[in-house]
A protein has these predicted regions:
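Cysteine-centered motifs
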Residues: 12-15
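Hydrophobic transmembrane alpha-helices
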Residues: 22-36, 131-214
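Transmembrane alpha-helical segments that form the membrane-embedded catalytic/substrate-channel core
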Residues: 29-43, 74, 102-124, 173-191
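Membrane-interface helix-loop junction between the first two transmembrane segments
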Residues: 38-55
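Membrane-interface helix termini and inter-helical loops of multi-pass transporters
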Residues: 48-51, 80-91
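Loop-to-helix transition at the N-terminal end of transmembrane alpha-helices
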Residues: 51-67
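Core segments of transmembrane alpha-helices
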Residues: 65-79, 102-105, 146-156
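Interfacial segments of alpha-helical transmembrane regions
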Residues: 89-103
Length: 214
């Protein structure tokens, strides 16, 4: 028995509904990841763990980073399992631009990381006698944007989307960008509390993510 046109429409509707559920799950997973990542980094939650963990709290940031990496790998693995349907057939120059944008983002992010104390950034435990105060830095890429690591990340994920041109890569780019933008608000509140007028003046002079633009 052959399929008529109405049968084909019905099958397409089922497939589209199934795909939509997969993409909605992807969005939900990004939201959950962002919530966990932010909640565990909040001062209130960290104070609770500090009371519970005692001297072992010095491993908190290390465990936090390990958990973040494991969850991110799981999320990216799920994305790779989604149907890889291209939103458009990209021209060769689009692919070249996308690759260039991606690697510019990666290089900016790597350059930005060099401005951090990597042991502290990764969460390597320090002796209890080590000073905990951080230094207000404005050198290197921080002369041009306040959050160069986030600038590089945004360029990389959008370069990846332009190259892949799939719905799941678009969802990832949007989710990462929105999360970064929201995260900057809370991060800068913390920086203002920590550095006061010096950071307020710095924020007034220097762009957030893109020089002379934003």
């Amino acid at each position: 028995m052959g399929l008529n046109l109405s049968h084909l429409y019905f099958l397409c509707a089922i497939c589209n509904a199934h795909s939509m559920k997969l993409y909605l799950l992807q969005i939900s997973l990004w939201i959950v990841y962002g919530f966990i990542h932010s909640a565990l980094a909040s001062p209130k939650v960290k104070r609770i763990f500090e009371q519970k963990l005692g001297s072992f709290f010095r491993y908190y940031r290390l465990l936090y980073n390990v958990l973040a990496i494991v969850l991110l790998i799981g999320l990216l693995w799920y994305q790779r399992l989604l149907p890889k349907e291209r939103l458009w057939a990209a021209e060769w120059w689009v692919g070249g631009f996308a690759i260039t944008l991606f690697w510019i983002g990666v290089l900016i992010a790597l350059k930005a990381l060099r401005g951090y104390d990597l042991r502290e950034f990764l969460g390597a435990p320090k002796p209890s006698t080590s000073p905990t105060s951080s230094e207000f830095r404005t050198g290197g890429l921080l002369r041009y944007v306040r959050h160069p690591l986030y600038t590089g990340t945004i360029l990389a994920v959008w370069g990846h989307f332009l190259y892949e041109s799939t719905l799941q890569s678009l969802i990832m780019a949007i989710c990462v960008t929105v999360y970064i933008r929201i995260g900057i608000v809370y991060e800068e509140r913390k920086l203002v509390r920590e550095f006061g007028d010096a950071y307020v003046e710095y924020r007034r002079r220097v762009a957030m993510l893109f020089p002379k633009l934003f």
